[in-house]
Amino acid sequence: MKENYCLQAALVCLSMLYHSQAFALERRSHLHPSFHGHHEKGKEGQVLQRSKRGWVWNQFFVIEEYTGPDPVLVGRLHSDIDSGDGNIKYILSGEGAGTIFVIDDKSGNIHATKTLDREERAQYTLMAQAVDRDTNRPLEPPSEFIVKVQDINDNPPEFLHEIYHANVPERSNVGTSVIQVTASDADDPTYGNSAKLVYSILEGQPYFSVEAQTGIIRTALPNMDREAKEEYHVVIQAKDMGGHMGGLSGTTKVTITLTDVNDNPPKFPQSVYQMSVSEAAVPGEEVGRVKAKDPDIGENGLVTYNIVDGDGIELFEITTDYETQDGVVKLKKPVDFETKRAYSLKIEAANVHIDPKFISNGPFKDTVTVKISVEDADEPPMFLAPSYIHEVQENAAAGTVVGRVHAKDPDAANSPIRYSIDRHTDLDRFFTINPEDGFIKTTKPLDREETAWLNISVFAAEIHNRHQETKVPVAIRVLDVNDNAPKFAAPYEGFICESDHPKALSNQPIVTVSADDQDDTANGPRFIFSLPPEIMHNPNFTVRDNRDNTAGVYARRGGFSRQKQDFYLLPIVISDGGIPPMSSTNTLTIKVCGCDVNGALLSCNAEAYILNAGLSTGALIAILACIVILLVIVVLFVTLRRQKKEPLIVFEEEDVRENIITYDDEGGGEEDTEAFDIATLQNPDGINGFIPRKDIKPEYQYMPRPGLRPAPNSVDVDDFINTRIQEADNDPTAPPYDSIQIYGYEGRGSVAGSLSSLESATTDSDLDYDYLQNWGPRFKKLADLYGSKDTFDDDS
């Protein structure tokens, strides 16, 4: 705005200056004799004439862009033969005569009727002639003169480009030339400073600078790194009037890239491509190809394609085929012929790599327009929603309407639609659908606790073309009703300590219980805990509802004893918050246990009373395990010995040795000299090295219950061994063996002593072995060998 005011003021000043000069010129033409044909009057009005006849005029000037209301007076033509009687007629011809410049044929005044622009035309050449008005006879020969258009500063500087793109190698030295921007001013460079330009940088410091006179942009910082910042935006200003105040200015933007460039940008061979795609095409299908040619090779010839604009930018995409350097246009989303039948894309091809040796070839990219038409196709039905969600109450009767799906044919034919359920998604056939209107109904009552959501798929197909089919997911939520009573959240069990005092454990907390309900939260909490009405005043225990879906069980009294009752069953009623509420009775088992002085549980089994005072549960388990292992070993060994077959031994006299061997095992060989000593079973307390102390009174003593004390361990072992011996003696099928089975524990009062060797039968020893006859068939061989001769003879 300030520059416009300055321009208007300058125009007014120049106009006034011109009129004063024209007036002065006209006066000089009358006063100075240097102008030919000029009349001059003296003070008394006498006309003085020069000796030489001719034109009295000068070179004329007119200011450009004059916008006054009256035509501009350019100058005046006058001949010295003009006496002022009107007989002379002035004629003007030449450039602009009669259109731009007009002359008063009587006075010779020349006016400019149009606004002149020096930038369009700087001067006009005209021809003047004086003729007789009546006869048109030339009175003087034609004379040529020039009208010059005087310049004013009415044109700002203009750059050759609105936006410049330049590249410079990264890490260049300070002062490295980047690019030169050039501006031109249409004003007269020979007149004043209207066309004298000075360049300056408005944006881009401190990275770049510009030479004020040449417009060369240079780097101002060293070691600029492309990896840190690749692109810079610089604004350059060019100002006329030598950069002084009042001058006009113009700006340009320079984008400087710290990267390599190549010398050939890609170019499309044509400006428009025509393509087509069917509305039945699926996303990813190729629509067409475009190709921008780049004469460079290698990495400098690689081209990438992008869709930069267009109404189909969301429906189509373009990829680069690096083998052929083609831009492949593909379908990104389905198109609909009935919605829109044509799309337009603006595709840009750009180089991947830029060569730093060629920085003045401009931007390395090109654009092309691609027009894509959509072809009609028979489309399947289209559901009004991409998915459906319906709700139904659980336990609803068969035939209850769940909801509806709706589809229509998008084609102009608008074919009727038939609906069906994908039975792969409804294997239990919970639902059925009306094929004509799409209403979904139940076929049986549903249970939310089994399945809260049911997901099925519904098909919609054209009645005349079953292949045109569409599927939509339908989610059915089963709404909850209060059909499940709450119950214990876990199998709870309570414990209470024995006590002698009846009030010792009064109000003692025993256990905290919580509940769980399979129904939804709306029909679940808050749970209410209570005792059944019939035992509301239970003398032993009470239930206190904590009002947080838990309840505490407390003892009403003390004096619990395992001898009297070792456990109690407490029924607890739990009600939920549903409408109507449901309840269930749950039984809590409370065991009476032995505790130490601190209340810690020691044992909750009533059988603990029958155990010895100093024997722990771990010791009992160890003893029982040892007994079982020994019994298994004995049974296995006896079984193996019974199955063993040995040849009949023939004793020779020289084989008898004079020694007696004592066998402590059941084995019959000399190598079996070790036996299992089960004497420790006579004292179970000594198994683990623990002997009860008699000098200290135990803190807890178990009182044995009459009639439940087990028999001593020794009796059990005796019975077992004697039973096995009787079975062996009475087995008629058992073959005879030459070895005797010796048991490590033979019972009380065994009359059998040590056996001598076989040689003792032939010695003169007074040993009597007649008792072998009483040992049964297994010892018959020994009885025959060692018996007395009389006995032998009697048997024989």
From Swiss-Prot:
Residues bearing attached sugar chains per UniProt: N455, N540
Propiece residues: 25-53
Gene3D superfamilies associated with the record: Cadherins, TCF3-CBD (Catenin binding domain)
Segments crossing the lipid bilayer: 618-640
Cleavable signal peptide: 1-24
GO CC list: cytoplasm; glutamatergic synapse; plasma membrane; Schaffer collateral - CA1 synapse; synapse
Domain Cadherin as annotated: residue spans: 54-159, 160-268, 269-383, 384-486, 487-612
Main localization, broad class: membrane
Membrane topology qualifier: Single-pass type I membrane protein
Pfam family, one: Cadherin
Keywords on record: Calcium, Cell adhesion, Cell membrane, Cleavage on pair of basic residues, Glycoprotein, Membrane, Metal-binding, Phosphoprotein, Repeat, Signal, Transmembrane, Transmembrane helix
Domain of life of the native organism: Eukaryota
Cytoplasmic side: 641-796
UniProt modified residues of type Phosphothreonine: T791
Described function: Cadherins are calcium-dependent cell adhesion proteins. They preferentially interact with themselves in a homophilic manner in connecting cells; cadherins may thus contribute to the sorting of heterogeneous cell types. Required for proper focal adhesion assembly. Involved in the regulation of cell migration.
Assembly and binders: Interacts with PCDH8.
Designated name of the protein: Cadherin-11
Species per Swiss-Prot/TrEMBL record: Mus musculus
Lineage: Eukaryota, Metazoa, Chordata, Craniata, Vertebrata
Gene coding for it: Cdh11
